[in-house]
């Protein structure tokens, strides 16, 4: 198999794909994972992916769950640092806080949403309105 130009970043891209594209409800097959890596111009062998999954668990604490459904094997990230409910709580607190500007709120929420998969991030796209609450204009926080 020919090597892609970003081959040295294979592990990083694989970890990014697994964290962004998978969760308890969304899994990927090995072929889908390889297709996602090809978007980054990275090629990989099946066995190297398995070894990388083991390294993710051993060295970074990112548990990759393997599920057999019919004839297909699916993979997804197990537990994360923050549960979806905790991320929602943080976002609600940011949005309802009067001392954080709207711009800073958007920036913080974008960062907090990176703790969950893109599917879960889409679920928490919501606005909290506190009647009579005025956001500060002070950008120095």
Where are these predicted regions, by residue range?
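Short, basic/aromatic recognition patches that contact phosphate-bearing ligands
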Residues: 1-92
């Amino acid at each position: 198999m020919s090597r892609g130009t970003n081959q040295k970043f294979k592990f990083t891209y694989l970890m990014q794909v697994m964290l962004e594209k998978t969760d308890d409800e969304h899994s990927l097959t090995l072929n889908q994972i390889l297709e996602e890596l090809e978007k980054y111009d990275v090629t990989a062998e099946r066995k190297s992916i398995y070894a990388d999954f083991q390294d993710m668990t051993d060295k970074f604490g990112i548990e990759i769950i393997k599920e057999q459904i019919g004839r297909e094997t699916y993979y997804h990230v197990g537990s994360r640092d923050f549960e979806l409910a905790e991320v929602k709580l943080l976002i609600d607190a940011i949005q309802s806080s009067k001392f954080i500007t709207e711009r800073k709120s958007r920036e913080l929420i974008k960062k907090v949403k990176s703790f969950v998969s893109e599917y879960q991030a889409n679920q928490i796209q919501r606005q909290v309105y506190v009647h009579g609450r005025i956001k500060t204009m002070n950008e120095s926080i």
